[in-house]
């Protein structure tokens, strides 16, 4: 179950470190550590981007991201609205379609 939900996104993630939290003045997030072909790449999300919220829900762990993907994929509108920040401090927003 764990891999299957996130395979759709085509990216790998890790929880951010305390140093990243301090540097960017944020409390939580998941860093995109690799982007392959898939929904994330199609939306323009790149390696290094830190996901903070998905569909207005805070994302602190890979499990929370997984839950958001699962809920969105079975909804009427299978889209992830992602808010986050780049290591430069620039904020960004993406809409990631989960439809094939």
What are these regions (language model features)?
Residues 1-100:
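C-terminal recognition in membrane/secretory proteostasis and scaffolding
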């Amino acid at each position: 179950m764990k891999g299957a939900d996130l395979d759709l996104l085509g990216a790998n993630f890790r929880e951010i470190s305390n140093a990243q939290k301090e540097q960017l003045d944020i409390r939580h997030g998941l860093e995109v550590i690799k982007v392959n072909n898939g929904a994330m790449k199609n939306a323009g999300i790149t390696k290094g981007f830190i996901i903070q919220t998905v569909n207005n829900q805070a994302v602190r762990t890979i499990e929370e991201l997984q839950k958001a993907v699962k809920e969105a994929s079975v909804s009427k509108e299978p889209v992830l609205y992602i808010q986050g920040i780049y290591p430069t401090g620039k904020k960004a927003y993406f809409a990631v379609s989960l439809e094939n």
